[in-house]
């Protein structure tokens, strides 16, 4: 994660330009202690790469600014201190603390300087957590005092492309692109096209998830049908085995012989009649087969000998 934070901080440094002691960024009175602390913090960040010391120096500068009267110079110093502090936190892989650290001094999101808010949006969107700064950016854009600032349009576009679209807030992105005067006609068309593509992609992903969830259900249904069919076949096999064993049992054969004798007695069948010879011959052969099958099961070794 350290490498990710380092790479995330590298492009962010170009937003306001590197702060070096040899190149004073602001024309500030030499008597202001916050100026010296700002220069010291920028040296620690850029030259010495001592990020922890740079962050502590920024915090000391903020404490000294509490006694300074509010002026345009102080506003610029506060903004520069926030930039240095955010970059130091990102380099230490503590980028998640950047927004809360800034709000500790500005109290409310609407009072954030545009450059500081832009830096936070780029940082959190690059680290794949746009939702962390989404509410802060929305509150800043809805404030009437901020809508007349020169940087309002660029922040509105960043809000759409870097925060709302990755977070899936397509309706809010569309409403902002259509109603906001910060978008030119070309920028509005570009934003609406991006929203349309994101909506199509979201629909495709939802359809794919639905089909993926239906697939296990189909497999379960097919498995249940196969299990029922297998159970039915096993039941039929057991029934068939029971019928066969019943037919081959000794009591059944005795009952069949008794029924045959009873039938002969009832029909008064004459065994001495010439017409009965074929029937008697077939009956004798049947009895011999039954006897042979019975004896072969009882005395298999004797029959082989």
From Swiss-Prot:
GO CC terms in record: peroxisomal membrane
Listed GO MF terms: ATPase binding; protein-containing complex binding; protein-membrane adaptor activity
Record membrane topology: Single-pass type II membrane protein
Transmembrane portions of the chain: 247-267
Membrane topology (Peroxisomal matrix): 268-305
Principal cellular location given in the protein's record: membrane
GO biological process terms held by the UniProt record: protein import into peroxisome matrix; protein import into peroxisome membrane; protein to membrane docking
Any matching Pfam family: Pex26
Subcellular localization(s) per the UniProt record: Peroxisome membrane
Keyword presence, Lipoprotein: no
Keyword annotations: Membrane, Peroxisome, Protein transport, Signal-anchor, Transmembrane, Transmembrane helix, Transport
Cytoplasmic-side positions: 1-246
Annotated function: Peroxisomal docking factor that anchors PEX1 and PEX6 to peroxisome membranes. PEX26 is therefore required for the formation of the PEX1-PEX6 AAA ATPase complex, a complex that mediates the extraction of the PEX5 receptor from peroxisomal membrane.
Record-stated family: Belongs to the peroxin-26 family.
Summary of subunit composition and partner proteins: Interacts (via its cytoplasmic domain) with PEX6; interaction is direct and is ATP-dependent. Interacts with PEX1; interaction is indirect and is mediated via interaction with PEX6.
Protein name, UniProt field: Peroxisome assembly protein 26
């Amino acid at each position: 994660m350290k490498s990710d934070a380092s790479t995330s901080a590298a492009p962010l440094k170009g937003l306001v330009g590197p702060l070096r002691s040899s190149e004073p960024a602001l024309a500030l009175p030499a008597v202001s202690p916050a100026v010296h602390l700002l220069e010291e913090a920028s040296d620690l960040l850029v030259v010495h790469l001592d990020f922890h010391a740079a962050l502590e120096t920024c915090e000391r500068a903020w404490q000294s600014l509490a006694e300074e009267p509010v002026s345009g110079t102080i506003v610029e110093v506060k903004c520069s201190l926030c930039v240095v502090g955010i970059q130091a936190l990102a380099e230490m892989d503590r980028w998640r603390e950047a927004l809360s650290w800034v709000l500790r001094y500005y109290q409310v999101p609407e009072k954030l300087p545009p450059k500081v808010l832009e830096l936070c949006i780029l940082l959190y969107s690059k680290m794949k957590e746009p939702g962390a700064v989404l509410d802060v950016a929305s509150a800043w854009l809805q404030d009437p005092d901020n809508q007349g600032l020169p940087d309002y349009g660029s922040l509105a576009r960043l809000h759409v492309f870097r925060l709302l679209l990755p977070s899936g807030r397509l309706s809010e992105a569309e409403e902002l692109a259509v109603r906001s005067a910060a978008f030119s006609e070309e920028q509005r068309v570009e934003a609406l096209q991006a929203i349309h593509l994101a909506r199509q992609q979201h629909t495709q992903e939802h359809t794919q998830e639905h089909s993926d969830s239906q697939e296990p259900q189909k497999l379960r249904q097919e498995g249940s049908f196969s299990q029922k069919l297998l159970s039915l076949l096993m039941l039929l096999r057991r029934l068939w085995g029971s019928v066969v064993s019943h037919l081959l049992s000794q009591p059944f054969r005795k009952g069949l012989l008794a029924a045959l004798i009873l039938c002969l007695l009832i029909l008064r069948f004459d065994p001495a009649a010439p017409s009965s010879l074929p029937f008697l011959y077939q009956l004798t052969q049947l009895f011999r087969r039954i006897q042979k099958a019975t004896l072969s099961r009882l005395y298999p070794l004797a029959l082989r000998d």
